[in-house]
Amino acid sequence: MNKYLVTSLLVFSLLLGTAACQGQASPTNSVLALEEHPLEGPPDPDTGIFLPVGTSQEAVLAQHQAERQRSVANYVEFSDQAGGPVMASRGSGETLSAVLLTSENDPPRQIVELHKGDQVVFSVDAGLPSPALPLQSLWSYDGHWVLEILYSEDEIWQGRIYRDGQLLNDTENYLDAFGFQLLGGKPFYFYQREDGLGYYYDGQENPLPYQEILHYGCCSASTLNPQPAENMVAFYAHTGDDWYYVELGNFSED
């Protein structure tokens, strides 16, 4: 065969291979794996039992049990010295704490103060007292801080997320924003707009096919709130009467 023809065929084959590779859809780092388990009905907050269709609760929970146990939930402690409930920051950034106080000028309104040592670096109105505490999440990472509060009024029950003092609900037009955490070391949270629910991860928004994600439940209902872990989050959701237990995450890190 003519050597020029061989060379031409080789180049053509390489070009075809390159084009084929470029045409393949590969998952991006900003899209997480979603594992959805339909339920026979709503989960029981008192017992923690849910009934998945066609399988058992034990089998579903066994899939990512080790990962789910690597919790990154924020916890609240009651401090007489601080004058109210306190939440310490998570993450690799500077150590911060959020303190819930009653307004001296307008009780019983609540205020959340963000402290760096003895210095107050941020303060925000947290609404009126409710069965659930306003302090929901606090992270410090990569030169940023993020504070999530539950804001409560007579007609308002809203998750609000502040990033470096900026309210994301306003800048991103969210009706609700909740469940902030670092997932795989990257910022993650749920949001709701008028057109539906979704999640933000690593700079990208992704829609979710649900009417509601259970969150901010108190007392026994708190067992149905999202469960954040290092590389995933587990939650309950529904659309109408169709209920789901969902695990969303970067399961390659299991």
Predicted regions and their residues:
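Bacterial N-terminal signal peptides that target proteins for export
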Residues: M1-S8
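Short, linear, compositionally biased motifs with a strong N-terminal bias
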Residues: L10-V11, D202
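C-terminal motif of bacterial Sec signal peptides marking the signal peptidase cleavage site
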Residues: G17-A20
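Bacterial signal peptide processing site
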Residues: Q22-Q24
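Non-catalytic tandem-repeat scaffold regions and their flanking low-complexity/translocation tails
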Residues: P27-D254
